[in-house]
Structures are given as structure tokens and as C-alpha cells.
């Protein structure tokens, strides 16, 4: 399926489906999955990158196991809002994944998600070695939680509009 806007997610999700968050690294893919209520992001084990065909197969299997209906993927914009090589790599990953799945993708600005994830892991007194193993999934959780919070805000706004009308 295509890349969609976050506002389109409620119409695309079927009952019992979750939303996945991805943080693409050069060596790993961080993965997080929402609960069925679409309120909380839960980190999953990172996927160690080998080559695209293997990475895609492992990722799609994990997404299927969690009944994912939409993928939110972090878009690593520069702090000034411009696109750099990592944005291009993320867009290329999505373009290459699209023929392999019917799942829609949503790009989500991930600026500072890795920094926030690392601070959270440090705050939990996770050792440097374990932080390296968990950082991408923790960042995926921050990306997904941001998207879930936005969805909640959209639903609340729609409910307020309905109540007012």
C-alpha cells in the first residue's frame, strides 16, 4: 500500500489490529508495537540487519505475529527541518518494502527520539552495553508513542466536534 497521513489511520485499521513503530538504523531496525487500545507503545527485540531481503522477511514475520495494520516509520529529519541522506535511505526502504506488503506506511518526524530513548535508558540505570542493544527499539517506542498520542488527540478533537454539533 501507499504512504498515508496519520489522520488516515483510524479508517485503515481493522478491529484487533495494532500499529508498529520502526526506527531504521544502519545495523539494526528498532521495532515497537502498540497495544490493542492504541494507547501504549511496547518495544520489541531489535532486528539485526543482514541484507534487505532477509531484513524484510524477518520484519514482515514480526509484524504479522503482532497483527499490525499500519507501520509508523521514523523520518530522521535534520534539526533545521531539511532532509539528509538518512531521510533518503528511509524513503528508499519504504519504497522497497511497498511491493512486499499491503500495510500502509506513515512517516513520523523522529528528531531527538534516539536522544530521548538514550536518556530514558540512562535514567533506568541500563548499562552502556545493554543500552546499545536496546536503543533502536526504545527509539521506535518513542516514535510510535508520539504517533499514538497524536491519534488520541485527533480522536478527542473529532469527538469534541461531534459533541458540539
From Swiss-Prot:
The UniProt entry, under InterPro entries, shows: RNaseH-like_sf, YqgF, YqgF/RNaseH-like_dom, YqgF/RNaseH-like_dom_sf
- The protein in question is named Putative pre-16S rRNA nuclease
Q: What is its EC number?
A: 3.1.-.-
Subcellular location(s) per record: Cytoplasm
- Name the enzyme's class: hydrolase
Keywords assigned by UniProt, alphabetized: Cytoplasm, Hydrolase, Nuclease, Ribosome biogenesis
* Function noted in UniProt: Could be a nuclease involved in processing of the 5'-end of pre-16S rRNA.
Q: Name one GO cellular component term.
A: cytosol
Phylogenetic classification of the source organism: Bacteria, Pseudomonadati, Pseudomonadota, Alphaproteobacteria, Hyphomicrobiales
Q: Biological process (GO) annotations?
A: rRNA 5'-end processing
Q: Which organism is it from?
A: Brucella anthropi (strain ATCC 49188 / DSM 6882 / CCUG 24695 / JCM 21032 / LMG 3331 / NBRC 15819 / NCTC 12168 / Alc 37)
Q: Which family does it belong to?
A: Belongs to the YqgF nuclease family.
Any single GO molecular-function term of the entry would be: nuclease activity
Kindly indicate whether the keyword Repressor belongs to this entry.
no
Transferase as UniProt keyword: no
> Where do the TM regions start and end?
none
Amino acid at each position: 500500500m501507499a504512504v498515508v497521513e496519520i489522520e488516515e489511520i483510524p479508517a485503515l485499521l481493522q478491529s484487533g489490529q495494532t500499529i508498529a513503530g520502526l526506527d531504521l538504523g544502519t545495523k539494526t531496525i528498532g521495532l515497537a508495537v502498540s497495544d490493542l487500545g492504541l494507547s501504549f507503545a511496547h518495544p520489541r527485540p531489535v532486528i539485526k540487519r543482514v541484507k534487505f531481503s532477509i531484513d524484510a522477511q524477518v520484519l514482515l514475520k514480526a509484524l504479522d505475529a503482532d497483527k499490525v495494520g499500519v507501520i509508523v516509520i521514523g523520518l530522521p529529519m535534520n534539526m533545521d527541518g531539511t532532509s539528509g541522506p538518512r531521510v533518503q535511505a528511509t524513503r528508499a526502504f519504504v519504497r522497497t518494502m511497498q511491493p512486499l506488503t499491503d500495510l500502509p506506511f506513515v512517516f513520523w518526524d523522529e528528531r531527538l527520539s534516539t536522544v530521548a530513548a538514550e536518556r530514558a535508558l540512562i535514567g533506568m540505570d541500563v548499562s552502556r552495553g545493554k543500552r546499545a542493544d536496546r536503543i533502536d527499539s526504545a527509539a521506535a517506542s518513542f516514535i510510535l508513542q508520539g504517533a499514538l498520542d497524536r491519534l488520541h488527540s485527533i480522536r478527542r478533537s473529532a469527538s469534541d466536534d461531534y459533541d458540539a454539533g
